[in-house]
Amino acid sequence: MARKSQTIFVQIAAYRDPELVKTIENMIENAKRPQNLVLGICRQYHPEDGFDNLDKYREDKRFRISDVLYTDAKGVCWARNQVQQLYDGEMYTLQIDSHMRFAPDWDVELIKMIKDLQKKGIPKPLLTGYVSSYDPDNDPKGRVQEPWRMVFDRFIPEGAVFFLPETIPGHKELDIPVPSRFYSAHMCFTLGEFAEEVQHNPEYYFHGEEISIAVRAFTWGYDLFHPHKTLIWHEYTRKGRTKQWDDDSTWGDKNSHSHLTNRKLFGMDGEKQEGHEGIYGFGTERTLRDYEEYSGLLFSKRAIQQHTIDKNYPPNPGISDFKNEEEWIESFSSIFKHCIDVGFDSVPEKDYDYWVVAFHGEDDKTLFRKDADINEINSMMKDPAGYCKVWREFPTAEKPKYWVVWPYSKSKGWCDRITGNL
């Protein structure tokens, strides 16, 4: 498809979002060339909301709006896929959420970053990241100005990879984006054909979306980068927004199917690899193993290289840096990191001595135990959300099957044993 010069196809999947109209207005107001913007929007709406009404844009030829009644919505990845069907040959594409803010001339700045990277011999750069935050109740004063990058956090029990944002080190001295291992669905700017080549799998629900797109983009020949300056802001708290799962009683089934689809894509936890060759699978420019070498993640073992743990930029030491592939694999560590949420109502006593905190594998064998002492318990009891967040991290070659929290009270002795499957 011939690309329309300098145009940007903006992808927005919005679910009952009071920030949608403000996001659109701020984007257009701060674009240097607003005439080059084409907005594809999947507006998932409730008839009684009103705050996301887009009627004033419907005669504007730059807008392609798909209205979906909230009861027909199937999740964010499904909605993003709907938007991608509206692509029509624009030169660039920007995927964002419906709660964002923009710096002046953001459009030409992003295009310049792409062109600067192409001049360095990178044909398909992709700019992405967990961009810095803003506060709708204190904007623009509440905007974080430092640019952020994404670093590895953990493999969650269901198999998806989680990331954390942090400030890009030395960003003030940078004049070009920095390499990234990961992809963020709330900010991605790249060549327009990305909307056709790496479409969101509508069978994904939420978690797993970003790591699967990162790998698929890489195998399609895209090189991932974080912008070295802040041009776009994101609202992270979800305060005042109804989420799709709030309205969908079957969201749990969708979520479980999504996690299974993701594990099959990567062949994790003994699952037979499926989906890697289809329309929502991997590209032909690079392989999954190429991504694992680049990123320092080994999906089949839920393992990670120290280079990635240390937050060093990719590429990681690859197979060619070792005697053989076996030695390269041995350079990975399987680290299990998990947060156990224990509601205050499950631990009502006031005189706990300690809590047993343990993780068990096959045949109920204990893989790891580190008890919570009185200081940790008292600290957790201050959580404003009403949950004790029991974080544990440990090396293990075997994925735990379940956890146990077993409180001991000075006056009552052993209390109710609390367990949860993983």
State the predicted function of each range.
Residues D139-P140, F162-D175, P179-F189, R241-L422:
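Terminal low-complexity segments of carbohydrate-biosynthetic enzymes
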Residues M1-R289:
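Catalytic cores of eukaryotic secretory-pathway lumenal/extracellular enzymes that build
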